[in-house]
């Protein structure tokens, strides 16, 4: 009996097979009973359902290829813009910002790639196994990023991809009644193999290096009662066509990883994006609605378009034949797909399907949030885009920054989402005194804030030398907040009283850390690499908004202390408890001194208090008004923050303010004044 069992599984001999041996092979272990031979499969014609599946796969691949080409074009355009904006020669001046280098200027480093000299602010120190530090300028760093994120590092250039032509459908499918369920339909490969839905990495790794997908798509999986032992990549792509828009949303959760680019020859880039764009829906998904009568061109599908990802404002209603679909509009830059700087986005050759496809239906409103939270094709490195606007109100010395929204932010939490907020700083001299932030929005990668943050006391001089840094961070309740990305804008490029809108990509810049207390005597909480800014030989301590008016009706001077901004931090917590002290000199006794209320733990206090001095107009010209700002401390002397003096002996804006007050009676005149670390008396 044992011999019988063993002989049952023995291979046939090398000699000629007898007729009965061939019959046993057809019914034994070599061929599954009821299976069709390859010859029988090739003689059969594909059904219309199978042709539709194939055509939809081709159409989706065309669309994803177009999206990939547009994405690469945007990366190259960004790189070219950085190259055009160079301001130095790379020898004596920084190649990027044009700052003087050498002993009298900033410290310089040499870029490892281009061998140009850059300052330490425009250079980035990269991690390397070398014993000495390796520096790269931001242009070369961006070029490496483009080379990495486009896949050109593997292909030594951008591959030109030509997809197969769609198959013509000879006959149309009869339309089923509305009440009749969609039964007896051709089962999809996904339903035939519910337990064989490989991950994205498995789909790419199963194909040997250099192997291309087979051109014969007629051998769709599952034509017999059982499929082949392993699924080819072409079959895996075709098995993903039956999912609807809901399957797209739920199939792209936070667990989606990086887009791997396996060495698959010229088709590797397309295969990775096709697999990512068409992940299979779960086997428990409900069957789609009954199909409509088929036209000469296959339907455009019912699923929603991919999420906006890195660049927002992409249309979801344009048909696949539209050359701008799915085009992402970035107002800050012009889209280009031509050859630039050695990189070229390969032109796309559309098949007949693109011209015969009907218009795509807009996705349902309830799916927009899930679509927006889905990944794009370079999800491993994208940081997202930020939309905001800037307005400088010159009359009120007010800079308004309206944070509108962000799209496609990098997921920071374990659920694939983030808790983003935006914070602003003015450079140089970033500190808590000029930090503004929005509220935090929970569990979203596409937050909409619509918040306006205002900087008061921004003069024309500040607009010429300040830079606005806008950072997007993820709030963490149980740890440190995480940095997502940032962008910077030089305020001298902003025209007064003209709102300017921006929609730009966030940059991968490490945020500056606070370096403890650089001035322990003053408790200044400054950021690393940000030195204390000085105007001439006078250290910047903040600004104060003062109003002056001589009232003829009351017969005296009315001094208004409105607010202070960007005060120096005097306490260990990085804040101050400021109040303002007024003194009309020469001494007029106790009635010459006034104090405001104390504002706790703030560097931008708002007082809105007025004080009256009973003095004749003729005597006012001989007086001077001493204004000082103090930090209130309990149990010890108050700390002096800064001050200014208005009067005939003053200079510049201070003298002008005092003169206008004397000249224009009964008229309130407001002016911003810089606080200085001048000689002062102790506060009482």
Curated annotation (Swiss-Prot):
Residues that coordinate or bind Ca(2+) 3: 529, 571, 577, 631-633
Bias kind Low complexity: ranges: 301-310
Membrane topology (UniProt): Peripheral membrane protein
Modified residues (Phosphoserine): 274, 682-683
Biased composition (Basic and acidic residues): 199-208, 243-252
Expressed in which tissues: Specifically expressed in brain.
Residues that coordinate or bind Zn(2+) 1: 94, 97, 119, 122
UniProt keyword list: Calcium, Cell membrane, Cell projection, Cytoplasmic vesicle, Lipid-binding, Membrane, Metal-binding, Methylation, Phosphoprotein, Postsynaptic cell membrane, Protein transport, Repeat, Synapse, Transport, Ubl conjugation, Zinc, Zinc-finger
Domain spans labelled RabBD: 40-157
Annotated positions binding Ca(2+) 1: 412-413, 474, 476, 482
Protein's UniProt keywords contain Heme: no
Entry binding sites for Ca(2+) 2: 413, 419, 474-476
Subcellular location: Cytoplasmic vesicle, Secretory vesicle, Synaptic vesicle membrane; Cell projection, Dendritic spine; Postsynaptic cell membrane; Membrane
GO molecular function annotation: calcium ion binding; calcium-dependent phospholipid binding; inositol 1,4,5 trisphosphate binding; phosphate ion binding; phosphatidylinositol-4,5-bisphosphate binding; phospholipid binding; protein-containing complex binding; selenium binding
Swiss-Prot/TrEMBL cofactor(s): Ca(2+)
Modification after translation, per record: Ubiquitinated. Deubiquitinated by CAND1 to prevent its degradation.
Pfam families, sorted: C2, FYVE_2
Self-association state and partner proteins as the record states: Interacts with RAB3B, RAB3C, RAB3D, RAB8A, RAB27A and RAB27B. Interacts with RAB3A; this interaction recruits RPH3A to synaptic vesicules. Interacts (via C2B domain) with SNAP25. Interacts with deubiquitinating enzyme CAND1; this interaction results in the deubiquitination of RPH3A. Interacts with GRIN2A and DLG4; this ternary complex regulates NMDA receptor composition at postsynaptic membranes. Interacts with SNCA.
Function noted in UniProt: Plays an essential role in docking and fusion steps of regulated exocytosis. At the presynaptic level, RPH3A is recruited by RAB3A to the synaptic vesicle membrane in a GTP-dependent manner where it modulates synaptic vesicle trafficking and calcium-triggered neurotransmitter release. In the post-synaptic compartment, forms a ternary complex with GRIN2A and DLG4 and regulates NMDA receptor stability. Also plays a role in the exocytosis of arginine vasopressin hormone.
Comment block on domains: Binds calcium via the C2 domains. The calcium-bound C2 domains mediate interactions with phospholipid bilayers.
Protein name: Rabphilin-3A
UniProt organism field: Rattus norvegicus
